[in-house]
C-alpha cells in the first residue's frame, strides 16, 4: 500500500462543476495534491485506501474513452467501489428524465458522482438533486474542469509556472468546453491567453473572457510558450463552419512550419481525441515538443486529487 499524500488540502466546495468559482488557492491546492499522485502512480503498488467504503458512480451520457477510463482508474486506485453507467444502459434511453435519474441514484446513496452530459448546465442541475459530491466530466460546450486542471499540471511541470506564460489555444473554440475551462483557469493563474481560429469558430464576445484574438496562425503563435490544439467538434456543429478538412489544415492545422512561429522551446498540447491531418500533423503530435501523452498520465493524478479533495468534505471523512 502506498503512503498517504502529505498534502491535507480540502476543496472548499461540495462539488466541482467548473473552473468558474475556484480561486487561485483552490487550483494550486489541487495541483499540489496532484503532483504527489503523479509520483505515487509511478510506484509498483499504486493502491490507496482514502476512498475505501465510498461508492463512485460514473454517469456518462456522452461517449468517452479517456475521461471515463481515467476517472475509473482514479477511483479504484483510491479504493472506491466504482460503478460505470452509460446512456445505453440507463433508463433515460427509455424516457426517464435527468431529474428522475438523479433522484433514483440518490436513493442508492452514492458518495461521488462523475457526470458527463451533452447539454450545458445539465451536471449542475443534477447536482442540486443529490446528496453526494458531483464532478463535472464535461457538459456540452460549457466546461470540462478536470481537463483544464490536468493541462495546468502538465504546463507547470514542464515550464515551472503558469503565471506570465503565453498560451495559444487554437482551433474550434466555439464548441469547446476544454477551451472555456482552460481560459478561465489560465486567467486566474496569471497566464496570457490567446485564441487562434477562423471567425466562424470563435464565439461572439470571446474577448470579454480576457483573451487576445488572432485569426491566423502566424500572428497567433508568435511568442507562444504553449500551443494547445483543439479538434473540430463536428458533433456539435449544425452547419458548415469550415470549407473542408484539407483547407482547414492548410491554414489552421499545426505542422512543423507553423510551430516555428512560436518560441523555439514551445510545447504542444491536445486534449484528445486527435484528428491527425486535420488540426495537427503526426510529426508534431509525436515529436519531441509534444506533451500529449504526458497529459493522459496527468489526467489520472488530477482526478485522484479531485476525488480525494471532495471526499475529505464528506460526512465521516
From Swiss-Prot:
One Pfam family linked to the record: OTCace_N
Keywords noted in UniProt: Pyrimidine biosynthesis, Transferase
Pathway listed: Pyrimidine metabolism; UMP biosynthesis via de novo pathway; (S)-dihydroorotate from bicarbonate: step 2/3
Residues reported to bind L-aspartate: 94, 177, 231
EC code: 2.1.3.2
GO biological process: 'de novo' pyrimidine nucleobase biosynthetic process; 'de novo' UMP biosynthetic process; amino acid metabolic process
Assembly, per entry: Heterododecamer (2C3:3R2) of six catalytic PyrB chains organized as two trimers (C3), and six regulatory PyrI chains organized as three dimers (R2).
Annotated family: Belongs to the aspartate/ornithine carbamoyltransferase superfamily. ATCase family.
Database matches in NCBIfam families: asp_carb_tr, PRK00856.1
Protein's name according to its UniProt entry: Aspartate carbamoyltransferase catalytic subunit
Organism, as annotated: Rhodopseudomonas palustris (strain BisB18)
